[in-house]
Amino acid sequence: MARIAGVDLPRDKRIEVSLTYIFGIGRSSSRKILTDAGINPDTRVKDLTEEEVSKLREIIEKEYHVEGDLRRQVNMDIKRLMDLGCYRGIRHRRGLPVRGQNTKTNARTRKGPKRTAGGKKK
């Protein structure tokens, strides 16, 4: 089983699809990596040689932010917005949608389950 960037790639899938299991690599970047490495995208992971795996590992480490580094970067960017106190940061802090979506009826994913206010007494 090939291990790249701390992720075990599934053996029976095509290498083009397997690379997308790494956080930060999608289909298009996967194709670009394989082109740079000179590997056929239809090759299965189990059929890769150790040379090809090391070449992939080298390209990914050199040119891409993936896994832990990328997650840390994203979290730091969100924290920076919150510290600045800008509109987007405030929306993140309150757990509301950040990109201008309506919140009157929808946005349940972001807001969480409904919290009903206490009943009104006479």
Swiss-Prot record:
Basic residues compositional bias: what residue ranges? 107-122
Q: Which GO terms describe its biological process?
A: translation
MF terms from GO for this chain are: rRNA binding; structural constituent of ribosome; tRNA binding
Please provide the record's keywords in A-Z order.
Answer: Ribonucleoprotein, Ribosomal protein, RNA-binding, rRNA-binding, tRNA-binding
Q: Which PROSITE patterns does this entry report, sorted A to Z?
A: RIBOSOMAL_S13_1, RIBOSOMAL_S13_2
This entry carries the following GO cellular component terms, namely:
cytosol; small ribosomal subunit
UniProt region (Disordered), positions on chain:
93-122
PANTHER family from the UniProt entry: 30S RIBOSOMAL PROTEIN S13/40S RIBOSOMAL PROTEIN S18 (PTHR10871), SMALL RIBOSOMAL SUBUNIT PROTEIN US13M (PTHR10871:SF1)
Q: How does it assemble?
A: Part of the 30S ribosomal subunit. Forms a loose heterodimer with protein S19. Forms two bridges to the 50S subunit in the 70S ribosome.
Q: What does this protein do?
A: Located at the top of the head of the 30S subunit, it contacts several helices of the 16S rRNA. In the 70S ribosome it contacts the 23S rRNA (bridge B1a) and protein L5 of the 50S subunit (bridge B1b), connecting the 2 subunits; these bridges are implicated in subunit movement. Contacts the tRNAs in the A and P-sites.
**Family, as annotated:** Belongs to the universal ribosomal protein uS13 family.
Protein's name according to its UniProt entry: Small ribosomal subunit protein uS13
Q: Which organism is it from?
A: Syntrophomonas wolfei subsp. wolfei (strain DSM 2245B / Goettingen)
The opening ranks of the lineage are: Bacteria, Bacillati, Bacillota, Clostridia, Eubacteriales
